[in-house]
């Protein structure tokens, strides 16, 4: 059992907690959030506009959050260095505020905890994606990143294609659901003028670092991919559009067969597969990192193909945070 503390009880923090309860093997013993009081935590965890009402029991009692009869310590510290993770046995910390995303900033948690998993991309922390590069993890790392939801969708698919056919180069578009940092009505956004426009009635072109992060996770693809995103007015579930030039010619049926085989073997539970005529809401609550849509892709010639993969950018990503915690704890214990 991995004892975990969660810093930041926003979208990802709450859904990581839900996943931990579903999967088992990860015991959330403490939550820190200076901006949400205990009674409001109960409400926010119980009700969710996308993923529905929490079906278990939850209440506030004696200054603790009681979930399924189990007490969880609650802290309200703004400085991670002041969170007493050690006093409650939280050995591993999920840093899900979106603020402390570098090694230097996230290391403040190490005054109480033993290891930090950042639920966001990091400029300098080692980045790991389940099904892609976990074997490169070293227990000496104290702060690591679970990358982004888009990277978790893209890289398993890219790895399968690259290993089987070779990727010469490629372009990525991600059509991405709304996130909390976007504006509901037009407002100031000095660094990203388009990002200041209302998400409710616009398709908003934006940047994505996912293509660059692929190169960190799969070094042989470094510099071979680049991309952009479009933010769209949906609440959850996004889709990656990957266009690649292949080293080895292959017809679309061969490519589909390779992905289907991986989804049933090496990447089972990470890379899903569907041949149904699906739309985005069909994947709300999906725990796969990436679901390849075999009927949505197209091919121009044997070396040039467009591949489509869906992902629940909240739930699927949060499940990988839990999986990464379990993997890391197992490897640390094997030392």
From Swiss-Prot:
It is an enzyme of class 1 (oxidoreductase). SUPFAM superfamilies: Glyceraldehyde-3-phosphate dehydrogenase-like, C-terminal domain (SSF55347), NAD(P)-binding Rossmann-fold domains (SSF51735). One of its GO terms (cellular component) is cytosol. Its EC number is 1.2.1.12. GO terms for molecular function: glyceraldehyde-3-phosphate dehydrogenase (NAD+) (phosphorylating) activity; NAD binding; NADP binding. Pathway: Carbohydrate degradation; glycolysis; pyruvate from D-glyceraldehyde 3-phosphate: step 1/5. It catalyses: D-glyceraldehyde 3-phosphate + phosphate + NAD(+) = (2R)-3-phospho-glyceroyl phosphate + NADH + H(+). Homotetramer. This is Glyceraldehyde-3-phosphate dehydrogenase.
